[in-house]
Curated annotation (Swiss-Prot):
Belongs to the HepT RNase toxin family. It comes from Shewanella oneidensis (strain ATCC 700550 / JCM 31522 / CIP 106686 / LMG 19005 / NCIMB 14063 / MR-1). It comes from the Bacteria. Keywords: Endonuclease, Hydrolase, Nuclease, Nucleotide-binding, Phosphoprotein, Toxin-antitoxin system. A motif (RX(4)HXY motif) lies at residues 97-104. This is mRNA nuclease HepT.
Length: 133
């Protein structure tokens, strides 16, 4: 594992920790715009770091050239570096990131809550798989 991947993993871990710290029990999330911004920004950062890692591995191992951020995870799954379910979940995160970054549509806070409560472990699972390589 090289410094690029090590640094990206550190970013993901830091962002997950920050999300967990600021989100707390979630009782204030829908009323607190600053809290929403913090959680969404850190989800974006997690997603970007995962994309960067995937692109780096795709390039290093010459797995192909992704045509989109989602394709980065597809290539990893096609080459059995991550599972298809993990690839699918990370591709959904890219969709959430795209909505948050580009304002394609209003971000549904219920989806953000669901991600925080049920899918932060997708980032952790991705880290574990990458570290095992």
């Amino acid at each position: 594992m090289n410094d690029i991947i090590i640094n990206k993993i550190a970013t993901i871990k830091r962002c997950i920790k920050r999300i967990q710290q600021v989100y707390g029990d979630g009782s204030q999330f829908k009323q607190d715009f600053t809290l929403q911004d913090s959680v969404i920004l850190n989800l974006q950062r997690c997603c970007e770091a995962c994309i960067d890692i995937a692109n780096h591995i795709n390039r290093q191992q010459q797995l192909g050239i992704p045509q989109s951020s989602r394709d980065s995870f597809t290539l990893l799954a096609q080459n059995n570096l991550i599972t298809q379910p993990l690839s699918d979940n990370l591709k959904k995160m890219v969709g959430l990131r795209n909505i948050a970054v580009h304002d394609y549509q209003e971000l549904n806070l219920d989806i953000v809550v669901h991600v925080v409560q049920h899918h932060l472990e997708d980032f952790e699972q991705f880290i574990d798989v990458i570290k095992a390589e």
